Regions:
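Histidine-centered copper-binding motifs that mark active-site loops
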Residues: 26-27, 32-326, 332-333, 353, ...
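Active-site pocket scaffolds in enzymes
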Residues: 26, 113-115, 160, 166-171, ...
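Short, charged beta-turn/beta-strand-edge "cap" motif at the junction between a beta-strand
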Residues: 148-151, 287-289, 336-338, 463-465, ...
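N-terminal export signals
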Residues: 5-26
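Short, surface-exposed ligand- or partner-binding patches at beta-edge/loop junctions that are enriched
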Residues: 195-198, 338-351, 515-526
Length: 541
């Protein structure tokens, strides 16, 4: 039974009539709901000072009626830019040493508008605003110096990498503004895959990511069967801009459903052009705060799915579409074909059950917002080329074995409308709680405890009315089966993942193990939900 906890239901009728009628229309028109800066922060959240909503050279903040820029206001159609690559400062074999500086950078984005101040890794004002690609190999000793030039504390979380707990950028390990921290870890054999990095300070993760702080990681293996293939990187993010070029603050609907900017970007650009002159290996990242990407070509042409978060799996799978929840990654093989053609890489319509305001205000109000419509990501021109031989077997993914312990994670939510209607500080919504096992996140409180090296079976149960992507730090896991509406479906293939979507009313069972003692986080990867408490701590002993 799906359960959403409602408090102060006496407000429902009046509140629903006030808000529900215009909520979806306003979202579709992208007028936003900008004037929510006065909402009370949650009592159990640390005091993170948000950046000013305008964040632009002392310009006035957008007023409550400030509208968003039109969905076609950003230029489109430029050739897809290659990602910047983080330079290795070391000359020692097997050592990768580099520096990442997080800082505000003004960039000219919207024609006719003032420069937009992004937060990014590096000072570049041209080229992709995405953080630089960290390109490393299994066995490398990695040492990255992080310099925080932001107005907030921050961290770097190495999403999916098997790094020690004290090197993983957990929210309890903050780097103060103006401070420096060095992260050190070694990449073990078998860790080749497609990863990414982003901040993880509690109650500021969403803001720091939507302002631009995220970047890709590729870990390579010496025995990669696709090493000789041309490789293309597509880092998908989104951006929510006001008409004057300012990054718009979160409104109540952003906090409730997760923020989706009106601009979907690939390597920092809107709808770029890709020219395919032969078969290619693509690595695709969903670096959005909340947007789901059901990627496909608009003409239905198939492609091969060859890898997940943690790298290649056993054999290629031919598919016509592939769902990537926020935080997920995929490796694909895209064929040029035997004749010239064109297709649009598209994020197809997907219904993740986003709440309408009326749902939040009344237990009797059922339904949700319409599905996100299809969205073009890139235009792809295919030039004919001889096909490359794709190996029938890619990489063995051995079964983890029988579990010796079992865990359960339950996603839930609670809306207190009396609190949500009160004015407060910092734009944080009071009374909106996203929970794990009935509680919101508290630093250092162990939600679950595991023993190092033990194989465990985890069941992730979604008792809310919308999808939530589950992410577990410090390891990769294997999805075993999914159960919804009383029907259990075994996972059709074995793969390494660190993020998996859990649909409303669904139970997903995974097998996992942790190799080092310490604190690991697990949470929903809709970043607003994570910030509002849908996160737990795993204590590994």
């Amino acid at each position: 039974m799906l359960r959403r906890h409602f408090l102060s239901s006496a407000l429902a009728a009046a509140a629903a009539s006030l808000f529900a009628r215009g909520a979806f229309a306003a979202g579709q028109a992208m007028d936003g709901m900008q004037g929510m800066e006065g909402m009370e922060g949650m009592d159990d959240m640390p005091d993170m000072k948000p950046a000013p909503a305008h964040a632009r050279h002392g310009k006035p903040a957008p007023g409550p009626a400030s509208a968003l820029a039109a969905a076609d206001a950003l230029p489109a159609g430029a050739p897809l830019a290659a990602l910047r690559v983080l330079a290795n400062e070391s000359r020692e074999p097997g050592v990768f040493r580099a520096t990442l500086v997080a800082q505000p950078v003004a960039r000219a984005l919207l024609p006719g508008a003032a420069p937009t101040t992004l937060w990014q890794f590096g000072a570049d004002t041209q080229g992709p605003a995405v953080g630089p690609l960290i390109d490393v190999r299994e066995g490398d000793a990695v040492e990255i110096r992080f310099v925080n030039r932001l107005p907030q504390p921050s961290t770097i979380h190495w999403h999916g990498l098997p790094v020690p707990p004290d090197q993983d950028g957990n929210p309890s390990d903050l780097v103060a503004p103006g401070a420096t921290r060095v992260y050190r870890f070694t990449l073990p054999k078998g860790s080749a895959g497609t990863y990414w990095y982003h901040p993880h300070p509690h109650m500021a993760t969403a803001e720091q990511v939507f302002r631009g702080l995220a970047g890709p990681i590729v870990v390579r293996a010496a025995d990669d069967p696709l090493a000789g293939w041309p490789e293309r990187h597509l880092f998908v993010s989104d951006l929510k801009l006001a008409r004057d070029g300012a990054i718009a603050p979160n409104d109540m609907m952003d906090w409730m459903n997760g923020r989706q900017g009106q601009f979907a970007l690939v390597n920092g650009a809107r709808r770029p052009r890709i020219s395919l002159t032969g078969d290619e290996r693509w690595r695709v990242w969903n670096g959005c705060s909340a947007r789901y990407l059901r990627i496909a070509f608009d003409d239905g042409r198939p492609f091969a799915h060859v890898g997940t978060d943690g790298g290649l799996f056993d054999a290629p799978r031919e598919v016509a579409s592939l769902l990537l929840a926020p935080g997920e990654r995929a490796e694909l093989v895209v064929r040029a074909g035997d004749r010239a053609s064109h297709a649009v890489l598209t994020a197809l319509e997907y219904d993740r059950g986003k709440m309408a305001m009326a749902m939040a205000m009344s237990e009797a109000a059922h339904g949700s917002l319409p599905p996100d419509p299809a969205l073009p990501l890139a235009d792809v021109a295919f030039e004919p080329a001889a096909p490359r031989a794709l190996p029938a077997r890619l990489r063995a993914v051995p079964a983890l074995g029988e579990p010796v312990a079992r865990k359960e994670v339950v996603f839930g939510e609670q809306m207190d409308m009396a609190a949500m209607m009160r004015a407060g500080a910092h734009g944080r919504p009071a009374g909106m709680r996203f929970m794990v096992n009935g509680a919101t996140f508290e630093p250092h409180r162990a939600t679950l405890t595991s023993r190092r090296g033990e194989i465990e079976s985890w069941t992730i149960r979604n008792e809310t009315d919308m999808d939530h992507p589950f992410h577990l730090h410090g390891t990769q896991f294997q999805v075993v089966e999914r159960e919804i509406d009383g029907e259990t479906t075994p996972e059709p293939y074995r793969a390494w993942r660190d993020t998996v979507n859990v649909r409303k009313g669904e139970r997903v069972r995974i097998l996992t193990t942790q190799t080092e003692r310490g604190e690991r986080m697990f949470h929903c990867h809709i970043l607003e939900h994570e910030d509002l408490g849908m996160m737990g701590t795993l204590k590994v002993v």
